[in-house]
Amino acid sequence: MNSWLRYVITLCVVLCLLSLGTLGWLAFVTTEAGPEIGVFKFSAPLQVLQPKESSNGRGKEADALAEGSEVQAGHEDLLAKLAALNASKAVVPDEMLLSFRSPEALAAFRLRAREAGLQVLYSDSRLNAARVRYQDAARLADELVKHGPDYQNIGPNVLIWVPGTPEPPPKDAENAGGLAAFESSGLAMLGVGVVDRSRWGQGVKVAVLDTGVTAHPALQNVKVTHIDLVKDGQPYNGHGTAMASLIAGQNGQEGGVAPASEILDFRVADAEGLGNVGLVAQGILQAVDAGARVINISLGTPTDTSLLRSAVEYAQSRGVIVVAAAGNEQLAQLAYPAGYAAVISVAAVDAQGRQAYFSNSGEGLFIAAPGVGIVSAYSEGKTVIGSGTSQAAALTSGAVSALLSRHYQAARVPQVLTQNAFRTGAPASQVGAGILRLP
C-alpha cells in the first residue's frame, strides 16, 4: 500500500474520531487497570498555502498564495481558498501563519493588524513570522491583496500531535506484533546499564515540547521549569511526564539516561495530545532563549510547513540540537519535524534490535533507539509501559544531554552518535546509522 493511500485511509479514521470526540494516543499501556486510550493517527497531507517551490523540493503542486503578484491574483479566488482551508479538520480554525519578506514588513503589519481585524497571537522577527486569528475572512483577504508584496508565504496553522501506536498486524496480535519488549532493559542496549550516570546531563537544559510535565517521584529531585503555552486550564496528558522521565528520571525503573539534566517543560499540546505547529515553533524559539541545548519533540504531523522548518533551522544555527520522533504510522516517510535535515530523527527498535512494526522509515532517518515496551513515569504518580518512536526520541535526547555534559561539543554530537551506533545490517531508511549506543 503506497504512502498516499495510507494517508487517505488514516484521514477517514481521524475524521471519525473527531466526530466521536475520542482523540487520544495509544503509545502507553498503563500498569493499572483502566479504559483503553483511543488512537489518533496522522491525517492526510494538507494542501498548505505556500510558494510552489519549497526549499526541500516538496509542495510543488501546493496552492500558491504568497509570491506578491500571486496573492493579488484575485480577491474572490483568495477568499474561496481561505474558506476551504478553514473547513479542514487538520488545521486550527480561524488561524493563519504569516511569513514576511523582512523584519520591517512584519513590524508594519503589527501596526495595522488590529485595524485589519486580525489578532496577533505570536510574532517573532527572527523568523519574520506571525500567528494570527481572524473573524472575517474577507478582511484577511483584503489585507493579503493590499499588502501582497510584503508576504513571503502564508498557510494554515496545521495540527500536530502525539503519535498513536497502530494495532499490531492480526497474525501477531497476541505478541504485540512479534516485538520483544525492553521493559527496564532499554538503558542496557544503549551500553550504559551499569555505568554511574549520576552526573550525566549536569549543566544541560533539555526542553521537552510536549503535553506538559507533572510531579512524579522519578522527577522529584530534577529541576523542572514549567512553561504552559496552551493555557487551557485542562489536566495534563501523561505523555510529557513520560518523556521527561526517560531523559532525566532518577527513580529505579523509571530512571532516565541523563538524570542530572534540567528539564524545560514547554506544554504545546493539550490533554488529548493535540497541538499546532504555531505553538511548537513558538516553543522552539522560547526554548532557545531559555538556554536549552537540546530540544525533544515527540510529536509529529505529515505536513511540511515553512514556519516549523524555519524554527528548527534557527535552533540549529544557535547550536541547539533538536531531536524528534520519526512517527508511528508504518509509512515510508518521516513525520515533521523529524523529516527536516536540521533534526536528529529517531526510529524505534525492539529488544532484539528489529525495527518496530509501527515505526516510520524514510530517507534522511538519522538513528534508531529502544521504543518497544519501555517503562517510564506517567501522570498521577503512575508507572507505565509504552511503545513508540516518542520513547526512542526521548532516550536519544537523554543521550545527547549526557554527551554534552561530558564535554562533547554540540557540533560533534551527531558524528559521535553515528560513529558509535550499533550496525544491524538493516537499511538506513529503517534504522539510520544504526541503534543508539553511547561511548
Predicted regions and their residues:
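C-terminal subdomain of the subtilisin-like protease fold in secreted/lumenal serine endopeptidases
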Residues: L5, I37-F40, P45-L46, V288-I297, ...
